[in-house]
Regions:
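N-terminal functional modules and adjacent low-complexity/disordered segments of proteins
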Residues: 4-7, 43
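Glycine-centered tight-turn and secondary-structure capping sites
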Residues: 15-16
């Protein structure tokens, strides 16, 4: 839903919510970690693997805005790093670092529905996009800047709905 200064999505206000707010909403289902992909700076993320939002279930992905200094300190103190792909590692945070990480503001919320969506379902739920961009292979990016939503519509894979504050849409 659209708010005066941003949007409210999955019960959280963007901008304004922190990872602690996500933890309050999702409890121990929320898993916080740093993700480091080769050639890119690490990012602070949190996931809920089995989230139900109304009639649809799927995976929630929260992106937080941690400073490069905090990310480096947390990585230096990390409990462990484990590979999630050839180029990406998940970095577990120590308790004191996780407590600090929970205070970081959310900048984006993603949702990967467990069921396949199609163009008709997107139009029914969100209306006509302001713009449709062609991506790689069979992926289209449906842009809804007024509501802070970008959807990656994948003819062969899972869709990704990404929410940011409308004021941050172009930047993110």
């Amino acid at each position: 839903a659209k708010g005066a200064t941003g949007i409210r999505v999955f019960g959280l206000q963007l901008p304004g919510a922190t990872l602690a707010d996500a933890h309050a909403a999702w409890g121990d289902e929320l898993k916080v970690a740093m993700m480091a992909t080769r050639g890119e700076p690490p990012v602070l993320e949190a996931t809920v693997d089995n989230a139900r939002t109304g009639p649809v279930s799927g995976r929630l992905l929260f992106t937080a805005d941690a400073s490069p200094q905090a990310l480096q300190r947390w990585r230096d103190n990390a409990l462990k790093e484990e590979p999630v792909s050839a180029d990406t590692r998940r970095i577990a945070l120590r308790g004191v670092d996780q407590a600090e990480a929970l205070r970081t503001p959310l900048v984006g919320i993603g949702f990967i529905p467990s069921t396949q969506l199609d163009a008709a379902a997107l139009r029914s739920r969100f209306g006509e996009p302001a713009e449709v961009l062609r991506g790689a292979a069979e992926v289209e990016h449906w842009m809804y800047p007024a509501t802070g939503l970008a959807v990656a519509l994948d003819a062969r894979g899972r869709e990704l709905l990404q929410y940011v504050a409308p004021a941050d849409f172009e930047r993110r």
